[in-house]
């Protein structure tokens, strides 16, 4: 897909409609696909700022992955430990934590 176009559509939506956790998550995923990890991180974090959104678990996990791609393994591990306290049954996160412990 054309991630540049998708990113511009999502940014345009946000500028007109205001904050939306689902759109921030999709924007972050587009930025990850473009290897724009700092932009992805900013999108995931913006989504997390929206109170009561239904994507908090997804946004938190994606934030951790963005930190990994930025090679900030220490911050990723701190966030992963907090994530697993909130979502202890997430098997993908448990495997990811094992990966982080080797960094």
Residue ranges of predicted features:
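Canonical tetratricopeptide repeat
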Residues: 26, 60-62, 96
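Short coil turns that delineate tetratricopeptide repeat
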Residues: 18, 52-54, 88
């Amino acid at each position: 897909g054309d991630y540049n176009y998708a990113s511009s559509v999502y940014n345009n939506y946000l500028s007109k409609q205001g904050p939306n956790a689902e759109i921030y998550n999709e924007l972050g995923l587009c930025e990850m696909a473009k290897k724009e990890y700092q932009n992805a991180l900013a999108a995931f974090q913006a989504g997390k700022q929206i109170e009561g959104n239904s994507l908090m678990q997804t946004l938190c996990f994606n934030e951790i992955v963005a930190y990994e791609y930025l090679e900030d393994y220490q911050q990723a591990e701190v966030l992963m430990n907090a994530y697993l306290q909130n979502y202890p049954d997430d098997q993908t996160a448990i495997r990811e934590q094992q990966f982080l412990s080797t960094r």
